[in-house]
Design a protein with these regions (language model features):
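Structural microenvironment flanking redox-active thiols in thiol-disulfide oxidoreductases
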Residues: 70-110, 121-122
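Short loop/turn microsegments at loop-to-beta-strand junctions
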Residues: 33-34, 55, 139-141
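Structural micro-motif
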Residues: 110-112, 129-132, 136-143
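N-proximal helix/coil linker or "cap" segments that precede and/or mark the start of modular domains
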Residues: 5-35
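Short active-site neighborhood of thiol/selenol oxidoreductases, capturing the structured segment around
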Residues: 49-70
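A short beta-strand-turn-helix
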Residues: 36-55
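Thiol-/selenol-based redox modules, centered on thioredoxin-like
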Residues: 137-177
Length: 177
């Protein structure tokens, strides 16, 4: 009996490891941004091509209405006018559903789209998915995508209290080149 339990646990651990190891490689500057086709809280489908010709701040975050994610989203909200003046749109992505996104956006007056990547396929294409088998969580990664739909800058280590300011600084510098 103990051997059967041990073998079952080993099989489960192996399956979980194999699922986690299928993550896409991390994207780097100049890579073509992977396309996405995701609904927002109202069911409207957003695609990368919708943002062609403009800068896009595509940020992945773990969970609606949690402390770090709320801080990050509210800073993007507060700095949105500056980002838009620089020609950028902001879009958030997590594995939460549209209902969760709608409640989160309403609670904090978030004026930008939050997209539902329930199956985690888009997060995985961006290398931004933690897949634990039954549980999938988006990593806190951000991609600054240029008007030609190429990755201009990646952010894999994010300080939620100043992340939007870091993007403003980088976007200002990139546009000056």
């Amino acid at each position: 009996m103990k051997l059967l339990v041990l073998m079952t646990l080993i099989a489960i651990a192996t399956i979980a490891y194999l699922k986690m190891s299928k993550a896409a490689p991390l994207l780097v500057s100049s890579d073509v941004a992977p396309n996405f086709n995701l609904p927002d809280a109202n069911g409207k489908i957003h695609q990368l091509s919708d943002y062609a010709g403009q800068w896009l701040v595509l940020y992945f975050y773990p969970k609606d209405d949690t402390p770090g994610c709320t801080k990050e989203a509210c800073h993007f909200r507060d700095d949105l006018a500056i980002l838009e003046k620089l020609g950028a749109k902001v879009v958030g992505v997590s594995v939460d559903d549209g209902q969760s996104h709608g409640a989160f956006a309403k609670k904090y007056s978030l004026p930008f789209p939050l997209l539902s990547d329930i199956d985690g396929l888009t997060a995985n294409k961006y290398g931004a998915l933690t897949n634990l088998g039954l549980v999938k969580i988006a990593k806190r990664y951000t991609f600054l995508i240029d008007p030609q739909s190429r990755i201009a800058k990646t952010y894999f280590s994010v300080d939620t209290s100043r992340h939007s300011l870091e993007i403003i600084d980088d976007l200002t510098e990139l546009k000056a080149k």
